[in-house]
């Protein structure tokens, strides 16, 4: 039984507005995307601009120039091993392949720089240059670099080369992974989109409070109240 009709129907009307707005948010009315997709893309564009650290990573990689390593790497399968040979040879390494296993001798610094140059092109959304360089898909190139670095890191730890392991791990996470994830995302500055960012934060708080008050008024209309 409704004890207070004014509060109950007022809360019900607020809930109806909440639901209507939610339907709009989940509808493809923002350039063919729903509201969540639109905001997710916006935040990705903004975060890409602030996450770019490849020049700093190149400086760290240069410190390993002249550091010659002999590595034994096991790749996922024969196909990935064959594709990875191209990457390593482009970096000046000597590679012997046997199935999915690679025996690599090369300058550690040159290998790191070669991977970072490809990552830099991907970060700038110039994947065509990467694919034409190796004659296969640019995303697969970066994935193969990432897989190579994972295998190299494993072998470096076996050899107790922990400084090199730390360096390649950082470059893999901050260089390769980000260039792969942000590929084809157009970077934007916070200063250029501060209006929509401020609106989204204010809207989120207001929308949440609106929902809370609608529930509260409906329960009060039913005669239910919180008491100390």
Question: Which ranges hold each PLM region?
Answer:
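Short beta-strand/turn micro-motifs at beta-sheet edges
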Residues: 57-59
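Long, solvent-exposed extracytoplasmic domains/loops
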Residues: 61-170
